[in-house]
Every structure is written in structure tokens, then in C-alpha cells.
Swiss-Prot record:
Biased composition regions of type Low complexity, renumbered to the chain: 39-83, 317-384, 418-452, 473-615, 686-714, 772-808
GO biological process: positive regulation of DNA-templated transcription; protein autoprocessing
Keyword DNA-binding attributed: yes
Organism in which the protein naturally occurs: Dictyostelium discoideum (Social amoeba)
Record GO cellular component, one term: endoplasmic reticulum membrane
GO molecular function list: DNA-binding transcription factor activity; sequence-specific DNA binding
UniProt keyword annotation of Cytoplasm present: no
Domain of life: Eukaryota
Protein name (database record): Uncharacterized protein DDB_G0292186
PROSITE patterns found in the cross-reference section: ICA, NDT80
Keyword terms: DNA-binding, Membrane, Transmembrane, Transmembrane helix
Composition bias, Pro residues: 757-771
């Protein structure tokens, strides 16, 4: 088939002697060859672009074979070529291998969001809204597009299948599952499910007109008896979901066309995909999508209007915007020129070959592939029939014969690729482009959305009281020169590693090589975070090879002062991991000016601005790269512990709490006292916290060691406490920058209205200041000085601790003491546990007797010893009973008056703190509730006035009724002792009622009633069953009786009929017998009639004799009348 279209001499119209069967066999064999050789050649096209000459020739061969078979199968009668004609009948069309997935050229079966108003939001444990799983739907088979109807067609007797790719935007953890917000309540999500249904709607989506239609799923055998509704599919951890063998049971209405045009009253079906979150055994919609309208037909029409390119496309659907993919490869540019304006869609089907599979992208556009494959070295042997290589090696053949295709090149749907690994293949093999370093400039947005799920998307600044619960704002900012996590991989030496190799080979040059490239590289302005993790890696390798004489090498690393200015204004927990590797290798010759070269050693210590840079943060943890995190804080508290133990501070009860003393010591030591001893401890901690390699042969130690603390309060707005440098540390030296300091600082502080009496304090010894050494001193002296500083670092700490122990201070309500870090708190707890309970004070600084001070708060006319403190969570606490409008609180909180609560009241009820747990008999609870009486009452005036009540009428129970043995509810009544009213009246043994106990008793009674109601319902159901059974029995008996009676009546009827018939026969027989007998025996009677003048009877001549009666004489005629009587005849003479 290679020569079928390329070589004009292989087949020449009617002159061809090749048999049709051979052509068919060749076509089928070429299919297998094409399947085997397609992917290997495609992989060579994408990867080995410089050696693409041979691969292009092989691809041309395979593609031309495929083109021949494809075009031959689509032809019906004739093929026109440049050399001749080829005539085939319809029976001679070569069979084409059925492909399951076909890429559509023109049409897109799209899905759009549906019913957004009914979507529920997903949030995490920090209250940040999460994106729901994104779906990429691929209608893999069953649908085809109709040009006439301008709609998608589905035939009811077929089945269709949906392949859904799921892209999870967050990780589902069973330990901390996502939460769903429902009417202000939050529930954990158990699993995610995918549901599908069919709806009836018009061409435009209208939710109000939605009617659900029957959509069924069959088994693999497609048995009608096994049809069922598509069940929900579990998709919690799935990335690919397939819903097979779906079909509509009914066709759409008004499918008939009018005048060969679409019916304006055409009915449409649509598919609806819904992602539900299952929580509390209920399903809640989190996202939903609806498909394009479908026309469901019963059978294929005679003239099929469906296009020749059935498609099963799908677009990536998400309720969140997704960024566009930047495919900058040479093959994609070809495809983009043939899109006819269609762009931004993902593949609609999955193209499967023997070794390569194109999987649709299920992401939200987080990955940007910048494949800079410059294929300018390929040979020019490719002809007009050379195949087009698509993305990922998919080859799409061109159409060499214009009469066989509608377009000269296929119109392919742009394909979006799944690149979760962010692989940027920068194969710049372009000999025509010498700027190879600039080929990586397209990689600016790699990994740009890898951290989409940071916990700071809300960016809410906490401004309320920390005693109230709030959502933590967690952020993990890894700013390795990445603004908004954009890795600018510009290979133009603009990285953090500023390797400034200044090779100065000239004489008398003033090389002021200031490394200004790192000034603002790592300024992490986390103004709204509560937890902040800042990892700043600044590697400044300054290799200044000065090989000439008289060079003034002022290579001052002044830029390091601003490298790590982490302006964390409202951070509560700050973890600062700063690693400043400043390798200053100054190899200068013998003629260099030592005065200028020695400045580099002192500038290395300027990297210590990380130690005190965030002194206003409440809890600071400086973690160095070598895991040496103790630093000054550990040494300070170690000295505090040793001083306290040596002075036997815990011998007796101090004049104020021990924790408060330690808080004051920590506070003063962490502020300006830290500044006083910072000069001596500076060089020591530089070596532990900053990897500074000072390879310098000079000995100049200037006084720039303390310059690193200039940025301690840079850009910080957190309220903090400052102390003035003075010899006495009393209350008057405290200053508060902001009156709202307690808002941003959840550290404990103590309330005290009365200022203590200032005690005479010993003056602290002046701290020795380090003096700069001369330039002529040797390097060994510099090293010995650093060792002496290391040995004497605890001396100023001991002085500070002793000074603080001798000058205890109290704090007022408007002042604030910053608590220590968790490390410091552990140190304090260990000191308290290890100290003996009874010792003797041996500290000479504490020998002076001091009067114990009390924290006094005025409440009405009484003064009570009340000590309030603030917990690390920001709440105030106090040990003892508290009364509101009550001078003598009997409980932890006694309130005289109304209490308004906007939230919920909770009580501890954990099973692990309870013993002897026994169930309560609900029958007894019901009996107690039945005995309980509710009253309407009015409070007395004296009680209302004494308790500051506003309502005098109420409804409730009487404590005396509950205190009787017959009606005893456990823990419902409490005796509170005598109560004195405002008028002096004393109520003996005042009783109060626990309504919670009554409520629980009512719950038990309700349960018992519920049981009884259930029993009654069960009995009623039993009675109903019995009634129905009895009625059934009666009905059946009546039916049987009726049937028996009917049968009896039928028998009687038959008997009566028989008897009647027999009677008739008897009657007729008797009549016949009588007739027969009557004809044989005739009875004759002679009647004589006499005719006289007057009848015998009338004349009186006739007698009463028989003869007289049988004969009469007619007097007129004197004639006798004879009468003969016989049966049936008579005669008269």
C-alpha cells in the first residue's frame, strides 16, 4: 500500500493486473505493521531530534500505508490520483480494523457545571476551602454527531460507556479527612462517590424543567432481567473510573423531522454526573456536571446524517479556573495551526496503540511543559506526504488526495497532557541558535502551582482576643529565590549561589565588589501567619583571587545584613532556619593593603542578625543547619538553673510565685540584657548558627561585631515590651508599645493593681566592652580571644540572674510578660521538680527581709486575695470561686441574675474517667417523672431585689417535692446552707435544683414511653394481622359456603327439572290412554222430545219420572223428540 498513493506506476487504473483479494490481504497486514512501528518511530521523533533523518523516512512509509488503508476504506466508487483512476465496487472495499477510541476532528461533547447553588463546600481542619475532585469525562463509545440535527445522537439499542478521569486536588487522609460545611455545622467526610443519572430537558438547561428519565446499566451478558440503576461508584482514592454498559430505555419524543429539517419541538436527554461526599450516612453534592443535549433514537434512519467522524470527546470540567498549558514544542505548533480557532480543550478520547497510550489530563493546569525541542537539524527529505508528528509521538497522516478529505490536514482537538512530575525537557539541539543558555527561559512557571494547598489561602490576620477559638493560618514558605513558589530557572547565573569570581589581574584597582545580589532575596514578609517556617539558604561564595599588587579589596559582604530579615509581624510560632554560608576566600598577594583586606573577617559576623532579628516574636526557635539549636537560650536558662540551685532559691516560700520570677528573669534576659552580652557571645554563636568559613590571613578584628543587631525590630508590628538600660529594674522601666499587646501575644501575664514597694537593689557590675586589637597582632591572639570569650560567656549571665533574683518585680494589668519557649518551660518544670521542698536561703542578695506583696482587686466594698493569670492559649484563669453579683460564691461560678450564652455549654463525659458505669432502669425514671409536678409561681419581692432579677413570674418545680423519699431524683436537689436576703431575712437550708438531673430523668422517661409506644404499635400490628387473618378465614369460609350452596341449588334445580319433565310425560300418557279408551266404548242416550202445544213442563203434563224426564211431548205437534247422546256426537230426531 506504500505505492498505492505515492508511486503512480504501481496501480494505473484499468491497466492494473493485481487482484482485489491481494490488495485486501496487503491492507490487513499493513495494519499490524503500522501498529508495531508507529510508537517506536514516534518516540525517536520526540527524543532524538538530531538523528531524525532515518526515523522520518520510516514514519513516512508506515503512515503512507495507514493512509492508503484508511482512505481506501472510506472510498465508495473511485479514487482520483495524479497518475490515473482506481475503480472499486462497494463489495471491494477493504475491511478496516475497528478502533475503540477515535479522535474527533470537528465536534466536542462537552460538559458544563450544573446546579452550582446546591454545591456544598469542602474545608480542611484549618477552615480553608478545598477544591473538589476535578473530572475529565470521556464518552468512549455510543455517541455520534448529526450534522442535520446539529446535535449528538444515541441509538437506544446500543450501549454507551463513560471513562472519567479524577484529579484529586488534595490528599484524603483517614486521620484528618476533609470536612463538609452544612448550614453552619461541620461534618467529616467518609468517602467520595460518583453518581450518574439521566434528565429530560430542552436545548437550554433549565433546572425547573428537569424531569428524570430512565437510565439503566446491564451486566456483561446484557440481560434485560439484570438491568439496574447505575450504583454510586467509590472514587475516594481512584484516578480513573469507568461506567460501562449504559443505555436509555426510552427514546426522545418528536424525533421525526419536518421537511428534512430538525423538529422545533424536539425533546432532548442529558447526562448528569454528580460527585457526592458521604457524611453521617448521607450524601451531599459537592460538584455536578451536565452534558450536551442528546437525541435518543430507536433505530438508524435510512439516510444516516451522522458525520463520518464519530467522536467521544470530553472537556475537563472543574468549578475552579484552570490555567492554560503552554506547549511550546514544534509538533504542537503544527497542531495549533490546524485547530480552526479551537483551543484550550483536553483530548476527548484515549488513543491506544500497542505501546503508547495517551491518557487525558485530569489536572487543573498546574503543570506547564516547556519542551524546547529545536528540530532545525532534520533533513529536508520529507515530502508533502510526510506525516505530522503530534504530541507524545501520535502520528496523524496527511491527506495526499484532495478529493478524499474535506481538509488538507486533520483538524485535531488540542490535547492537554498529564505532567504531574513537572518534567521540563530542554533539548536545545539547534545549531542555528547559539544562545543555548536562553532556552531555559520558558521554565519560569514550573512548579508554580505545586503548593496550591498551602494553609494560608485565607490570609486572615488575627485581630481578636486569643481567648476565643480561631482558625490557625499555617504557611510553609520555602523562599529559595522563589517568589510565589515560581522557580525561575534562568541559567544566567541569577541563582542564590552568587559565585562572584572576581579575578583582578590589574594593578592599582579599587575593587569594591559589594555582593548586592542578595539584598532582597529572602525577605519573607509573613505578616499574617501564626506558624511560619522560613528556610533561607544564602550561599555567597566570594572567591576574590587578587593576583596583583596594591589592590584595595573592599569586598564587604554588607548585603548579608538584609538577606534574612524575616519580618514576621504577627507570628506566634516562628521557626527560623537560616543557613548563611559565606565563604570568603581572600587570597591576596604580599603587596596587598592589609588595612582593607582585613575588613572581610569582621563582616562575616554580620550574619548573626538571625539570632536577635525577631526578638518581638513570642516563641522563637533558631534552628541552625548543623542541628545545634541550643544557642544563647539554652545557655541562659542553664545559668539560671545553676544560680537558683547554688543560692538555694527555693528554700522557703518566696514573696511572689516562683513561675512569675522565672518569667521576669526570662523577659529581662531576652531583651536589653541580651544586647549587653551580645558583644561577647557574638563570635561564639556565629560558629554554631552560621556556617561562616573565615579563611583569611589577616588579623584585624574591628568593632563591627555588634552591627548585626540593627535589624531586630525591622518591619515588625507585634506589640512587645522594651526595657530601658538602667541599674535598677523596677516597674517604672517598663514600656508598652501598643495597648493591644495582649491580642497578638497569647503569653501569660499576671494582673496586679498595686505597685510593689521599690527595694534597694545592688548595682550591677559594668560589663567590659571588647576593645579592637591592633593590626600587628597575630592570628593566634585572635583565636585565643575567641576561646576566652567562650569560656567567660556564662559570667554575665550569672550576674543577670543574681541581679534579677535580688530585684523581683510585679506587673500591672496594662503590662505584659513574654513567656518562654517550650524548651524554657521544660527547663522551668525540671527545676521545680528537682528542687528540695525545704532549704535555707544562703544567697546573700536575698538576706534582706521583704514584705510579701499581694495582688489586690477591689470588688465592691471587700478586698480579696485574687490572682489572675493568662494561659498560653490566651485565656484568663483563676483558682477559687468566682461570684458575679454575689459576695459569697458557693460554686466555682455563682451568678445572681440572668445569664446570656450565645454558644453551647459542655460538660466532661468521657468514659475513660468514669467508673462503675451502670444503666438506669427507665421504668423508675418514668415513675419519678409521673410524680413530678410543674407549677406556675411568682418570686417574692425581697428575693428579686437581693438577686437582681428582672422577671418575677416563672414556671418550674419545687425543690421540696424532689426531696421527698417517694419522689427522689438523684442529684436533683442540693443543700446550700443559709441564705441572707437584702432585708435581713435568713432562709435556713436553702435548696437549689439541678435541672440537668431532671432533664436526664425526663430522657429516661421518654425512652420508657418510647418502648411502651413501640410495644403498643407492635401489638396493634399483631392485632391488625390477626384481624386480617380472621377476615380472610371468614371470607374463605363464606366463599366455600356459597360455593356449596350454589352446588346444592344446581342439584335441586336438576331434580326439579327432572320431576317436571316426568310429570309431563305422565300427564300426556294419561291423556293418550283416555283418548284411546274413549274411542272404544261409545255411550249413547236417546232423548225424545215431544212436540205438543205446550211443553210438558210448562203445561204441567210432565211428571218427575225418569220416563218423563227422558221424553217430552210437544203438545202442539204431538211429536216426540229423541235425543241420543254419545261421546263426541249427538242427533236430534
Amino acid at each position: 500500500m506504500l505505492g498505492l498513493f505515492n508511486n503512480s506506476n504501481s496501480i494505473n487504473g484499468s491497466g492494473n493486473n493485481q487482484d482485489i483479494d491481494e490488495i485486501k490481504r496487503e491492507q490487513m497486514s499493513n495494519f499490524d505493521q503500522f501498529e508495531d512501528g508507529l510508537n517506536n518511530n514516534n518516540s525517536n521523533n520526540n527524543n532524538n531530534n538530531n538523528n531524525s533523518n532515518n526515523n522520518n523516512s520510516n514514519n513516512n512509509e508506515n503512515i503512507n500505508r495507514k493512509t492508503g488503508s484508511t482512505l481506501l476504506s472510506s472510498s465508495t466508487s473511485q479514487l482520483n490520483s495524479s497518475s490515473g483512476q482506481i475503480s472499486f465496487s462497494k463489495d471491494a472495499v477493504a475491511p478496516t480494523k475497528k478502533r475503540r477510541y477515535i479522535v474527533d476532528k470537528d465536534h466536542i461533547f462537552s460538559w458544563t457545571p450544573y446546579c452550582k447553588a446546591y454545591w456544598n463546600k469542602l474545608i480542611n481542619v484549618y477552615g480553608v476551602e478545598l477544591e473538589p475532585p476535578q473530572l475529565n469525562v470521556s464518552a468512549e463509545k455510543g455517541f455520534s454527531f448529526s450534522e442535520v440535527d446539529n446535535s449528538w445522537i444515541y441509538y437506544r439499542r446500543n450501549h454507551f460507556q463513560l471513562g472519567i478521569g479524577v484529579s484529586h486536588c488534595f490528599q484524603f487522609l483517614e486521620s484528618s479527612p476533609p470536612l463538609i460545611s452544612l448550614n453552619g455545622s461541620i461534618y467529616p467526610v467518609d468517602d467520595f462517590y460518583l453518581c450518574i443519572r439521566g434528565v429530560k430537558n430542552g436545548p437550554d438547561v433549565n433546572i425547573n424543567e428537569e424531569v428524570e428519565v430512565e437510565l439503566y446499566q446491564t451486566n456483561s451478558k446484557r440481560e434485560k432481567g439484570e438491568e439496574k440503576l447505575p450504583p454510586p461508584v467509590l472514587m475516594t482514592f481512584s484516578t480513573n473510573v469507568t461506567i460501562p454498559r449504559l443505555h436509555f430505555r426510552k427514546a426522545t419524543a418528536n424525533n421525526a423531522r419536518k421537511h428534512k429539517l430538525p423538529n422545533p419541538q424536539q425533546e432532548f436527554f442529558r447526562l448528569v454526573l454528580t460527585v457526592v461526599a458521604r457524611a453521617q450516612s448521607r450524601d451531599f453534592c459537592i460538584t455536578s456536571m451536565i452534558s450536551d443535549p442528546l437525541i435518543v433514537r430507536t433505530g438508524h434512519p435510512t439516510c444516516n446524517p451522522v458525520s463520518n467522524n464519530p467522536s467521544t470527546p470530553g472537556t475537563p470540567i472543574s468549578n475552579f479556573d484552570s490555567s492554560n498549558n503552554n506547549n511550546s514544542s514544534s509538533s504542537s505548533s503544527i497542531i495549533n495551526n490546524n485547530n480552526n480557532g479551537i483551543s484550550g480543550y483536553s483530548p476527548h478520547t484515549t488513543v491506544t496503540t500497542n505501546s503508547t497510550t495517551i491518557i487525558p489530563t485530569y489536572g487543573s493546569g498546574n503543570n506547564n511543559n516547556n519542551n524546547n525541542n529545536n528540530n532545525n537539524n532534520s533533513s529536508g527529505n520529507s515530502s508533502s506526504t510526510s506525516p505530522m508528528v503530534g504530541p507524545l509521538g501520535v502520528v496523524f497522516p496527511p491527506s495526499p488526495i484532495n478529493s478524499l478529505s474535506n481538509h488538507n490536514s486533520p483538524h485535531l482537538t488540542p490535547i492537554q497532557y498529564n505532567n504531574n512530575n513537572n518534567n521540563s525537557n530542554n533539548n536545545s539541539n539547534n545549531n542555528n541558535n547559539n544562545n543555548n543558555n536562553n532556552n531555559n527561559s520558558n521554565n519560569n512557571n514550573n512548579n508554580s502551582n505545586n503548593n496550591n494547598h498551602q494553609f494560608q489561602s485565607n490570609n486572615r490576620i488575627f485581630k481578636g482576643n486569643l481567648s476565643n477559638p480561631f482558625d490557625l493560618n499555617y504557611s510553609q514558605n520555602s523562599n529559595n529565590n522563589n517568589n510565589n513558589n515560581n522557580n525561575n530557572n534562568n541559567n544566567n547565573n541569577n541563582n542564590n549561589n552568587n559565585n562572584n569570581n572576581n579575578n583582578n589581574n590589574n594593578n592599582n584597582n579599587n575593587n569594591n565588589n559589594n555582593n548586592n545580589n542578595n539584598n532582597n532575596n529572602n525577605n519573607n514578609n509573613n505578616n499574617n501567619n501564626i506558624f511560619s517556617h522560613n528556610n533561607n539558604n544564602n550561599n555567597n561564595n566570594n572567591n576574590n583571587n587578587n593576583n596583583n599588587n596594591n589592590n584595595n579589596n573592599n569586598n564587604n559582604n554588607n548585603n548579608n545584613n538584609n538577606n534574612n530579615n524575616n519580618n514576621n509581624s504577627q507570628n506566634i510560632h516562628f521557626y527560623n532556619n537560616n543557613s548563611n554560608n559565606n565563604n570568603n576566600n581572600n587570597s591576596s598577594s604580599s603587596n596587598n593593603n592589609n588595612n582593607n583586606n582585613n575588613n572581610n573577617n569582621n563582616n562575616n559576623n554580620k550574619n548573626n542578625n538571625n539570632n536577635g532579628n525577631n526578638s518581638q516574636i513570642n516563641e522563637k526557635h533558631n534552628l541552625s543547619s548543623n542541628s545545634n539549636s541550643s544557642g544563647f537560650t539554652a545557655e541562659l536558662f542553664s545559668s539560671i538553673e545553676n544560680t537558683i540551685r547554688n543560692n538555694n532559691f527555693l528554700t522557703q516560700k518566696p514573696h511572689f510565685p516562683f513561675d512569675q520570677t522565672l518569667h521576669q528573669l526570662q523577659f529581662q534576659a531576652q531583651n536589653n540584657q541580651y544586647d549587653q552580652i551580645n558583644g561577647k557571645l557574638d563570635n561564639i554563636h556565629n560558629n554554631s548558627n552560621n556556617n561562616s568559613s573565615n579563611n583569611n590571613n589577616s588579623n584585624n578584628n574591628s568593632s563591627n561585631n555588634n552591627s548585626n543587631n540593627n535589624n531586630n525590630n525591622n518591619g515588625s508590628h507585634t506589640a512587645s515590651v522594651k526595657r530601658k538600660l538602667s541599674n535598677s529594674y523596677d516597674q517604672q522601666n517598663l514600656e508598652i508599645e501598643s495597648p493591644q499587646s495582649y491580642i497578638s501575644s497569647p503569653t501569660p501575664y499576671f494582673v496586679d493593681n498595686k505597685q510593689p514597694q521599690p527595694q534597694p537593689q545592688p548595682q550591677p557590675q559594668p560589663q567590659p566592652q571588647p576593645q579592637p586589637q591592633s593590626q600587628s597582632q597575630s592570628q593566634s591572639q585572635s583565636q585565643s580571644q575567641s576561646q576566652s570569650q567562650s569560656q567567660s560567656q556564662s559570667q554575665p549571665i550569672q550576674q543577670i540572674v543574681q541581679q534579677q533574683l535580688s530585684s523581683p518585680t510585679q506587673f500591672s494589668q496594662s503590662e505584659e510578660v513574654i513567656l518562654s519557649s517550650p524548651l524554657q518551660q521544660q527547663t522551668i518544670q525540671s527545676i521545680q521538680q528537682q528542687q528540695p521542698q525545704q532549704q535555707v536561703i544562703t544567697n546573700p542578695l536575698l538576706q534582706q527581709p521583704q514584705q510579701q506583696q499581694q495582688n489586690i482587686i477591689s470588688i465592691g466594698d471587700m478586698d480579696k486575695n485574687i490572682k489572675w493569670a493568662q494561659s498560653p492559649n490566651g485565656g484568663l484563669f483563676h483558682f477559687g470561686n468566682v461570684g458575679v453579683n454575689s459576695e459569697n460564691p458557693q460554686e466555682a461560678l455563682s451568678v445572681n441574675g440572668n445569664v446570656s450564652i450565645s454558644g453551647m455549654m459542655y460538660q466532661p463525659s468521657d468514659k475513660r474517667v468514669k467508673e462503675n458505669v451502670k444503666p438506669v432502669n427507665s421504668k423508675d425514671q418514668l415513675s419519678n417523672i409521673m410524680k413530678l409536678k410543674i407549677y406556675d409561681y411568682q418570686l417574692t419581692d425581697e428575693w428579686v431585689k437581693s438577686q437582681n432579677l428582672t422577671e418575677t413570674k416563672d414556671r418550674g418545680v419545687l425543690a421540696q417535692d424532689l426531696n421527698t423519699p417517694s419522689n427522689h431524683i438523684p442529684n436533683s436537689v442540693k443543700h446550700t446552707g443559709d441564705r441572707i436576703l437584702g432585708n435581713g431575712r435568713v432562709i435556713k437550708d436553702f435548696l437549689v435544683v439541678n435541672k440537668d438531673a431532671i432533664f436526664l430523668e425526663n430522657v429516661g422517661a421518654t425512652q420508657e414511653l418510647s418502648k411502651k409506644v413501640d410495644n403498643v404499635c407492635m401489638e396493634l400490628e399483631t392485632l391488625d394481622k390477626k384481624k386480617f387473618e380472621m377476615l380472610g378465614h371468614k371470607m374463605s369460609e363464606l366463599e366455600r359456603t356459597t360455593i356449596r350452596e350454589i352446588k346444592k341449588n344446581q342439584k335441586r334445580k336438576k331434580i326439579f327439572i327432572g320431576i317436571g319433565v316426568f310429570t309431563l310425560f305422565v300427564i300426556f300418557g294419561l291423556v293418550a290412554v283416555s283418548i284411546v279408551l274413549g274411542t272404544r266404548n261409545t255411550i249413547t242416550k236417546n232423548i225424545t222430545v215431544y212436540t205438543t202445544g205446550s211443553p210438558g213442563y210448562l203445561n204441567g203434563d210432565c211428571t218427575d219420572s225418569e220416563s218423563g224426564s227422558n221424553s217430552c211431548y210437544d203438545s202442539s205437534s204431538n211429536s216426540a223428540i229423541d235425543t241420543t247422546t254419545s261421546t263426541g256426537s249427538g242427533s236430534i230426531k
